[in-house]
Each structure stands twice: as structure tokens, then as C-alpha cells.
Amino acid sequence: MSGPNRTYSFGEGDDGLAHPSSRTHAMHSQYDDVSPISDGARMNPMNGQGMDHGLASVLEDGRQGWGRSPEPSPSLLTGSSATPGMDNLGPGAVGGGISGIALSVANSHDRLSGVEALMGTDGQEANIPAERGLSTTGSDNPYVPEPPEYRYSYGSNIALGAAAAPAGQLTPGQSVSHLSSTNPSQRNLYDIPYQDVGGLNAGPYQRHSAYSSNDLPVDINPDEIVDDGDDGFVPAPNSGSGARKSQAIPAAAGGAAAGGVLGNLGGLFGGKSAADTSYGPVPGAGLEAGEKGRWVKPKPGGGNKKRGWIVGAILAFIIIGAIVGGAVGGTIGHRGNEEPSSASSASSSSTQTATEDTSVNGDLDKNSAEIKALMNNKNLHKVFPGIDYTPWGVQYPLCLKYPPSQNNVTRDMAVLTQLTNNVRLYGTDCNQTEMVLHAIDKLEIKDMKIWLGVWIDSNETTSRRQIDQLYKIIDDAKDISIFNGAIVGNEALYRAGSDKTSAQTTLINYMQEVKDHFKKKNIDLPVATSDLGDNWDATLVQAADVVMANVHPFFGGIPVDQAAAWTWRFWQDHNVALTKGTNKKQIISEVGWPSGGGNDCGQGANCPNDTAGAVAGVDELNKFMEDWVCQALDNGTDYFWFEAFDEPWKIVYNTGKENWEDKWGLMDSARNLKPGLKIPDCGGKTAT
């Protein structure tokens, strides 16, 4: 994920698909182990109305093998249709991208889509967009319980996905090592992000080791950071918001800020400054390049423009310092020196720089005591088809001064190999892909595959650097079979704002260039892109070899007991349906749930209480995994879980009561499984 709340529309769009209600569904009697949920009506937490639920079942149109065939249950829809709204990354987020912070990060930027999408259409009923598949019942969904009423969905925040921390460029040859507490690259901007600090609430677990100290973070002067001028950043003016009480600088923009460059955030690929009018209850403020921020209603009269720029400049300066410190802290040795739960780490008792790590521990491999301990965690199960991953410290250009640690990547891969056989990267900067390949080689992992990531930015310099590095990686690879494909861009269309048409053309051109290079080199690898589920249309489907959609029920304000069903239903109706009549594969490229930090009620509105909507927490994360993971494994749903490890530096993107940006991992930054969290074992079945 990448950016504040991403939205998903239920519009027909250019795909020309018929309204869901017009489809005839044939049920199949499969997976009889899917049991019905409670008898009787369930209360809709959003409106208090009773909702009848039936059993999970399957549709014939491309949904084979998705459950048993119970009697169709009545529609769960009511007379209202909630519409959340935003998502991720700004063009400032340079190359490589980090896994992402979480949605609230981009609250300062409009979702770039608005209520205008509803204008000029004939709603099926009051306040319900005609393009929505409102008549589809939950009986066609293999997950239990069934989905709630249709509503606009969100994607991951800037915090999530690539937006989290834009990754950087190829790192000069450096020896592998650890990160030290005296090195800025080893420290988080805030030493104790999980403890109560001001408005920041403690997470489900406390900080350890390097993070538990009370030392002040190392100051970093952004003027000392190398910059190639390709990462523009400017904070959004502080607009009055009826939809959000707090706003945050987008993760991608924040990453760009690390370079110390202030610039106008135009639409992706030179997009216009007009806000996207596709979705959302309130028109945007025209910052299409911003992350997936919630809708921000402009102040009447426009406010004082000059004062706004002054305040913006000051805020930008502050954010630059924060992001620089936070991003640099991405390579914290905390990961390398903590012992994993149920596994004893044999080395790394103190934080070290990358070079010091190698000097002390050597180039870690499968025979290293520390690695053996990490690879023997009985609480981890290989039940995820894929996991989104970005190594720490790969923000460009910070990685040029504070190189990431090879040993830390090796440690991460030792853990990831117990969860999945498939890892997705977001960019090529800072040697991140090469480090992952080296780790796989040292660990002698034979069944791990990689989806290569290429960060596409509004600045051609960034995109060019990323693509050229992809070519080098492919050309230098000893064995191409380790790669599953290349993902060119993450949520590029979302970040394009209202100028999606030209952005799509540019994106498709980049994809075609990569395809041509592969063909020239006789490389048979699929080329795709990942974006919000509702940003896909027939044109993009035709250009991509694989349809990859980021779908986050949390940002849609979906109660966790309905989240799994909602996710599958949304994906089926908006993405799988687009591939009907083709042989193209569909993958959910990001899906997950935060382990703490508040709750989200969608629509850009404040929650009435702390239990409304989607609640972040370990119990809720367990519930979502319980409803999603094993059933997805049984029915063959292909997806990437977001994400394996927390990224504490992202605390800088937490705002008000939305403190989940740094809490999307199954494990903390030290690779400890979070207290109380249980990864399903699915009866011993594993992902292949």
C-alpha cells in the first residue's frame, strides 16, 4: 500500500461490464467445510439495521471453487451508501518505495476523486450510485461472514505499500553489516514510538532494545543529503476539513522531502492540478499528487493564500527534518539485534552500522547461529501466497550516505521464508533487489520467488533510474527463473489525480518498454502494474499481463467480521470481472490489517466511538486472518499480505487518533511476533 486512504469505486467505467445484478449466478457445491455464520439477522454496525446472512457460495462467472451453494440470502444493502475516500503516494516518493505507512498519512492531500462521479447518473435508489452492484447478495461469497453493504473502499495509506518510504538509488559497493545507535541510519526519528508520547498511543507491544532508550534521535541536516533534483515535495495547504479532523503529509511526499527539495506536486507524469472527481463525498483541493488522503473540504473564500504558503514552507521544513530522520532510521539495527519470539538470536547484542555488522558477524548464511534461530520459529506458518516487502534503509538519496545492511536483509529473508515463497518488492534503488537475491543465495532457499518492483514517479529522472536498474538486475541475474515478473509502478494512476488518462498512457508506455526489453533479451516474464482496485479498466487490463489490485477493507471502514467477505467481493466485481474472456491472472497486490492505532469509519468522517467501523488491533488482525488466510489458501485466491514487519519510523505520519501507520506488520521491527497474534496454520496446509 502506499498513501492515505485509497478509494475504490463501483463504477462500470470503460470496461463496459454489465451491472452485477444482470448476471445470472450458478452455484457450485464445493468446500462443504464452509459453515454458515450465526442464524438470524446480524445488526449492521453502521446503521443498526438487521442483516440476514447466508452461507458462503460461488458464482459461475469466473468464480469457480469458491464455496458451497446455500440458499441466497437477502441483500445486506440499506438505503444509504457510505463513501470513504483516499489513498497513497505522491510523485515525490522516489524510487524503490517502502512498503507503505498506512492510510491516514495522506490526510493532508485529497483523494483526488470526488462526488462529481455521482453526478449525472441515475441512482437505483436514494443516495446510491447506479454503477454499484447493489443487488449482489453475500451468498456468492466464499468468506464468512458475508460482506456489508457496498461502499466506497479505501486503499492503503501512504503509509502502506510503496508510499511508505520511497526507496532510493543503487548503493555504492559497501560491505554488509549492522546499524549503530550512533549512526542516524540506525535510529528512528522518535526513539520510543510505541510508548505514550503526547497524542501517540502505545501500541499492542512495547519497544525493545535500541528503541527503548531515552536518547534523543540524531539530528540530520537535510542540506547534507545528496539530491538529484528528481523528488519534488510541497505540503498541502491546511484546509478546513469537514471530513477529517487531522491531516498528514503523504508518505511518498515525505520520502521526497528527505532530499530537501521543495516543488509543486503536479499530477503524476505532469498531471494537472485539478482534483480528481471520480469518487468521494467532497471535491478535492486540487493536490492530485498527494497521497491517498481523506477528502478535505476547502475553506469558504479560499483563505489567505500568502499566509498559506508561508505556513506550508515552515511545515515543509519541519517535515523534511522529520522524514530525513525517520527515513534514515529505516535501517535501524533494532531488527538485527533483537531475539525473535520462540527463537534465540546468537549475535548482534548491540546496534551496528552495516560495515560493523559484517565485521562482527561476517556475511550471514544458513549456518550462522543467528540465522538458524530465526529460521526455527514454530509460531510462523507458510500460509501466505505472497508478502509485500521493502528492506530498511533503501530511501534514495539517503542510502548513499547511510547504506542499508545486507545482513539485516538476510535476517528478514530468514523470517519471510517461513511465511511465504513469494516476495514483492516496490523499487530497484539502493541495491535492495540485489540484497534480497544475495540473501536468498546465502540462505540456500530453493523455492523463493520475487516480483520485481519499479517505482514510477512524476519525475522522469526517477522513473528512468528505476527502469535502467531493472534492466541491469535482469541482465546480471544468474537465474531468471527466480523472478515471477516485474511490477511497473504502484498506484501511479491514483497519484495522477484527475489526469488519469494521460498518466495511464505514460504508464502503459513504460510497461511496453519493459516488455520490449524482455522480448529483446528473450526473457519470458509477465509485466504488470499495481493500483487501486477501481482504477483498473479495459485499457489497462489489455496492457498488463497480470491484473494487480490493492484492496484494503480497513480504510473502507469495514467492520472486521465482514472484512474478508467484502475484500473478496470487491476484488471479484472490480478486477476479476475485467479479465473475463482473457487468460490473464488476477492478484490482490496488497491486503492487510493494522494491529493498533485507532479505528476508521470510512467516508472521511470521524468515528462516533472507538468501536465503530474498522478497528485496529491484534484481536481484529487475528479475526481478519482467521476469516481470510485459510479460505484463500483453499480456494486459490492469490494475494500479497501487507506486511511482515512494522516500520517504526512511520510514526511521523500518525495524526490525532489515527496512529496505525507504523503498525501493519505481523511482527515488530525486531522480528518478534506481536504478543497475542496468531498466524493460522491452516491444518498444516502451506502456500506454494
From Swiss-Prot:
Keywords: Carbohydrate metabolism, Cell membrane, Cell wall biogenesis/degradation, Glycoprotein, Hydrolase, Membrane, Polysaccharide degradation, Signal-anchor, Transmembrane, Transmembrane helix. It is found in: Cell membrane. It is an enzyme of class 3 (hydrolase). Its EC number is 3.2.1.39. Residues 175-188 have a biased composition (Polar residues). Residues 341-355 have a biased composition (Low complexity). It catalyses: Hydrolysis of (1->3)-beta-D-glucosidic linkages in (1->3)-beta-D-glucans. It comes from the Eukaryota. GO terms for molecular function: glucan endo-1,3-beta-D-glucosidase activity. InterPro entries: Beta-glucan_modifiers, Glycoside_hydrolase_SF. It is a single-pass type II membrane protein. GO terms for biological process: cell wall organization; polysaccharide catabolic process. Residues 329-688 are extracellular. The chain crosses the membrane at residues 308-328. Residues 1-307 are cytoplasmic. The keyword Metal-binding does not apply. One of its GO terms (cellular component) is extracellular region. The active site is at E491 (proton donor), E590 (nucleophile). Its main location: membrane. Gene3D superfamilies: Glycosidases. Residues 1-49, 61-91, 169-194, 334-363 are annotated as: Disordered. SUPFAM superfamilies: (Trans)glycosidases. Glucanases play a role in cell expansion during growth, in cell-cell fusion during mating, and in spore release during sporulation. This enzyme may be involved in beta-glucan degradation. Active on laminarin and lichenan. Belongs to the glycosyl hydrolase 17 family. This is Probable glucan endo-1,3-beta-glucosidase btgC. The lineage of its organism: Eukaryota, Fungi, Dikarya, Ascomycota, Pezizomycotina.
